[in-house]
A protein has these predicted regions:
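C-terminal motif of bacterial Sec signal peptides marking the signal peptidase cleavage site
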Residues: 16-18
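Aromatic (tryptophan-biased) beta-strands that constitute blades/sheets of beta-rich domains
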Residues: 22-73, 107-116, 151-160, 202-211, ...
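Beta-propeller fold recognition
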Residues: 322-372, 376-407, 479-482, 492-498, ...
């Protein structure tokens, strides 16, 4: 009897050890992602704070940073992803390829090439959970790879690329699901965000950003035909999740056609809106529209970070949100009321409707807040907001024509010469919106920004310069040219006992007027 008990106890110990060492990262790992030394989610944690509790690099020693290594993919397609890091491996996605690298020395561990016919857009990243790395393909597929080997685990069809549906947003893993979305409303399709089963890619729920028949919001459109191709893409890096309340915060893009509003009279919900869903069911909890009847392609792009502040002795739960209209807003997540709104770029003639002759307006369609979210430092109580200062002339077409799978814009937005553009990195008081400092770049700032407990900020410029700044005053402490434009992820993590900064570069796109360069990642650390 005692022998049997010892055998049973031994088997129990083995089983417990097997569970503890099973596929990772697990849900508890992701829930605590903000406090670890890895980088497990597109914006580091579910709240989207892009804040790392790492202080090996500080304002006192940042000038001593040096490049450690560079991985060059030789892929010159558009590149705008945020890497993930888990236990010494760095995962990186380009338009068609997925890489696992050694997070200390850039050595490639494996590479996977996505099948299918890809369109001209890009991947913003992948989701990592339970031993699977899940990414979207530009022909509407979802692929799960074994995170250790790169071998395919499953594939599923999530979107219809023949209609113009393109999945750009980085997938986000939560519990037994992976959340993805359809962006690029300019093709005249209806945007959506949905969840698929992590185990096999089967659909779980879908929320359509253009209201369906029976939804009271359908009355904000002039006809069901217009709603059928109403836009509302979700295309920026990733939504935020309040894991305590089970809420998913989603930034929804512009209505379609972009510049020809005659065919879509009304406010056009849920476009240019912050939409808050039950993360487990996709049911709408609340929403707030910021650009009713948008006529300037002024997508809402930012749905985080989620953070807390004290105002007049009250503790408020906040969400930062904003978009291509150049305004950064903060809302009380409980009352849904706006606490502050701050212009982080030039705004002139911003509400003037396009005409056939043309109307000059700021920001242009390439201005304001783009695909990367602000960072939040709880230590300094500040938001750090990258933005684009670039105006355009908006023209309405003489007539409108819809062809499935082709651009459906109803006009144009001609950007000013790139020499007239610039970028801003603005530090704001997270409770009041008061500006603490601003850094000006001679080109648009679209790269990710990461804050640390060492009072550092890491980001990059389209000039190709990696920047390390003092988060307290915005002083540039270190600058290094990496050889390609930086419009992508800039993250920090711990490996081998030291803090490392990974800088992705190689943005190749006609929109941002930068030379083509291969998708690359360069690691920086102190000697």
């Amino acid at each position: 009897m005692h022998l049997n008990r010892r055998i049973a106890l031994g088997l129990l110990v083995v089983l417990l050890q097997a569970c503890a060492s099973g596929p990772k990262p697990s849900q508890p790992d992701l829930n605590e992602a903000g406090g670890g030394s890895d980088w497990l989610l597109p914006n580091r944690d579910y709240a989207g704070q892009r804040y790392a509790g790492l202080n090996g690099i500080t304002p006192d020693n940042a000038a001593g940073l040096r490049p450690v290594c560079t991985f060059n993919s030789a892929d010159t397609s558009r590149f705008a992803g945020n890497p993930l890091v888990w236990r010494g491996k760095l995962y990186l996605t380009t338009r068609a390829s997925t890489y696992a690298l050694n997070a200390a020395d850039c050595t490639m561990i494996w590479k996977h090439e996505a099948p299918g016919t890809l369109n001209a857009f890009q991947s913003r990243g992948a989701a990592l959970k339970d031993g699977k790395l899940v990414r979207a393909t530009m022909d509407g597929g979802l692929i799960a790879l074994d995170a250790e080997t790169g071998a395919p685990v499953w594939e599923s069809r999530a979107a219809d690329a023949t209609r113009g549906e393109a999945m750009v947003m980085s997938p986000v893993a939560f519990e037994d699901m992976v959340i993805v979305a359809v962006g690029i409303g300019e093709y005249g399709v209806k945007g959506w965000i949905g969840a698929f089963r992590l185990a096999d890619g089967a659909p779980v729920w879908k929320f359509t950003t253009i209201p369906v028949d029976g939804d009271p919001a359908a009355t904000t459109w002039s006809s069901s035909e217009t709603r059928a191709r109403g836009g509302g893409g979700v295309w920026t890096v990733a939504p935020s999740i309040d894991i305590d309340q089970g809420l998913l915060f989603v930034a929804v893009g512009n209505p379609a056609p972009d510049f020809f509003g005659d065919v879509r009279e009304g406010t056009n919900l849920y476009t240019a809106s912050l939409v808050v869903l039950d993360v487990r069911t996709g049911q709408l909890r609340w929403h707030r529209q910021f650009v009713p009847h948008d006529l300037h392609d002024h997508d809402l792009t930012v749905s985080g970070p989620l953070y807390q502040v004290s105002i007049d002795g009250r503790r408020l739960s906040m969400v930062a949100t904003g978009g291509k209209d150049g305004l950064l807003r903060a809302l009380d997540r409980d009352s849904h009321q706006e606490v502050f709104s701050v212009a982080v770029t030039t705004r002139t003639n911003a509400d003037a409707a396009p005409t056939t002759a043309g109307v000059h307006s700021c920001p242009g369609a390439l201005g304001g807040l783009q695909w990367n979210s602000p960072a939040f430092s709880p230590r300094l109580n500040r938001l750090f907001v990258p933005a684009v200062d670039w105006c355009a002339t908006f023209r309405k077409a003489d007539q409108l024509r819809y062809v499935p799978g082709q651009f459906y814009m109803g006009g144009s937005a001609t950007a000013d010469p790139v020499e007239k553009s610039r970028g801003w990195l603005t530090a704001l008081d997270a409770a009041t919106g008061a500006v603490a400092w601003r850094y000006e770049s001679r080109l648009p700032m679209v790269a990710a920004v990461t804050a640390t407990s060492g009072d550092m900020l890491f980001t990059g410029e389209l000039t190709g310069d990696f920047l390390a700044l003092d988060a307290r005053d915005g002083k540039v402490l270190y600058r290094h040219a990496v050889g390609g434009a930086i419009g992508n992820g800039v993250i920090t993590y711990g490996v081998g006992g030291r803090q490392v900064v990974a800088v992705t570069s190689g943005t190749a796109t006609a929109f941002w007027k930068v030379p083509a360069a291969p998708a690359s990642v360069t690691l920086f650390a102190l000697p």
